[in-house]
Design a protein with these regions (language model features):
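Conserved PLP-enzyme active-site core in the AAT-like
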Residues: 3-168
Length: 169
């Protein structure tokens, strides 16, 4: 996951001359603990989006409010982390919840899918899912063979769209 944040932070700086304080990472309150750690390591501000207690779905109204507050506070570039199976609940975020609001308010973003937990299961059990690279709004995906396939540590996989990795080379 941190690779995505590193790439997108640098992408915004390289392509838009963004300042660090103009970049923010947005993820649900159920996201993996590596997400806030990665934001901290890269000195990226972070917004934690509340979820519904029963369904664990992103609270759209609060997300919109948080995005508008961030914009009013000078945030211009948004790194979005959408979960494909959280470790605590197995919940899957709908990336469209994020992208529809970001686009409605004309906010610049990159969308990362954290599929470390569910990436080896969810796509195969949900044939109609658009949480894959057929969705042009998705910039990167993380999957981890350690979590579901019982492979050794260090078998995490990060995949991003062509041209993005150059921002960290």
């Amino acid at each position: 996951n941190i690779q995505a944040f590193w790439i997108y932070r640098n992408y915004f700086m390289n392509e838009f001359d963004a300042k660090l304080g103009e970049i923010v990472l947005v993820a649900s309150e159920d996201t993996h603990y590596s997400i806030p750690k990665g934001a901290n390591l890269l000195q990226i501000d972070r917004i934690s989006v509340p979820v519904d207690f029963e369904t664990r779905a992103i609270n759209e109204e609060q997300l919109e409010e948080l995005l508008l507050i961030a914009k009013a506070n000078g945030k211009k570039y948004f790194i979005i982390v959408s979960n494909m199976g959280t470790t605590m609940f197995g919940s899957v975020d709908n990336p469209e919840t994020y992208t529809s609001l970001l686009e409605r308010h004309q906010l610049i973003y990159k969308l990362h899918i954290d599929g470390a937990y569910g990436g080896f299961v969810y796509p195969f059990n949900n044939e109609k899912s658009v949480i894959n690279f057929s969705n042009p709004k998705i910039s990167s995906i993380t999957i981890d063979a350690h979590k579901m396939l019982q492979a050794p540590y260090g078998t995490g996989i990060f995949i991003c769209r062509k041209g993005l990795i150059e921002n960290v080379l």
